[in-house]
């Protein structure tokens, strides 16, 4: 039970499900919109990456120390749990992004969730759900690649416009 819970939290939730929201915000950041929020999400992703790897290592150590739980049934249970997490994340994406918008193709983003989930499964020694799938959003990987030694407090202050400077802007421009 502990190994499954660690897998669910580290690989399904933090490792896959958080990426829907992160990707949407980072797509705005990529377009120079909401630079401060985008940078904060990049710092958050740096921390999430550490959590994902920590929980993956803990999971793998538990499996190594308790080989008797690493059965075909347990492996399939984990894969099906990931499949349910993917389904829920895709529903979230469809709700947040009902049409192609903010420089993001819904289909590419849904495919990205399959891609990232398969990476998490493979990292835990499990068979992917969508073998051979390619990363449809390579820019997202680049956005997530933040220097580990970069410190929030040492970063440059991002400039913001006053709301009065946006007067006359339509929602489509934002």
Predicted segment positions?
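Non-heme di-metal
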Residues: 1-174
